[in-house]
Amino acid sequence: MDSTILIKLSGESLANKQKSLAIDYELVRQIGSQLKEIQNLGHKILIVIGGGNFWRGTSAAKNGINRNTADYIGMLGTVMNGLALDSVFRDLGIKTRVLSSMSLDPRICEYFVREKAMKYLEDNNVLIFVGGTGRPFFTTDSAATLFASEMGANIILVGKNNVNGIFDSDPKINPNALRYDKITYNQVIEKNLKVMDSTAFSMARDNKIKLLIFDIKEKNSISKLIKRQIKHTEVY
């Protein structure tokens, strides 16, 4: 098996609120161990990381901070998360490259150039994309579908916090909500179900990228998802 997958991680998935940790390094190590297993199955791995454990641009904008500025602060939060992933993954013996949509000091991380990124990927590096799209008013969901499209990934794993798929109603409110095992892009639109923001969702649909929605908080969920051993929703 030889395919390229992109894993969309929220910043919150790295946090441990009970321990008041913005980044729980034990959780990051668990993610890294799963990546090694996935690489051994022949997959090439891309990661897009959010920054919500540090900052949420939309919330800050509502409290009086200029939306452009708020979003750029959020992008810097993704850089912090990406560097944390990079450090832990390297300690686990995983080859990684942190690539930014924004121009930063090269001592911090590299600016994304597709040709170089493809070479790193061929050399079996896990690529960690930070900085979102590099522009305000776009979410990291949009960054995920953008990088998946550019890098030729055919699957995006969308990790949610304590929600193991797409439901016909909010499972946190309705205990009888039904989870979809599989659903088409058109059905999601017709039923007005929330998966990603509309820009990201449209890009994934147009580029025929399969989405797998799963609970990132479930133990070993990423490696289990690759083997289809946990509950999830497939959007195709």
From Swiss-Prot:
GO-annotated biological processes: 'de novo' CTP biosynthetic process; UDP biosynthetic process
Residues the record lists as binding ATP: K8, L9, S10, G11, G52, R56, N161, F167, D170
Q: Where in the cell is it found?
A: Cytoplasm
Q: The organism sits in which domain of life?
A: Bacteria
Q: Quick one: which pathway?
A: Pyrimidine metabolism; CTP biosynthesis via de novo pathway; UDP from UMP (UMPK route): step 1/1
Q: Name one GO molecular function term.
A: ATP binding
Per UniProt, activity regulation is:
Inhibited by UTP.
Q: Does the keyword ATP-binding apply?
A: yes
* Keyword terms, alphabetized: ATP-binding, Cytoplasm, Kinase, Nucleotide-binding, Pyrimidine biosynthesis, Transferase
Per its database record, what is this protein's job? Catalyzes the reversible phosphorylation of UMP to UDP.
Q: Which family does it belong to?
A: Belongs to the UMP kinase family.
Protein name, entry field: Uridylate kinase
What organism, scientifically named, is this protein from? Mesomycoplasma hyopneumoniae (strain 7448)
* Organism lineage string: Bacteria, Bacillati, Mycoplasmatota, Mycoplasmoidales, Metamycoplasmataceae
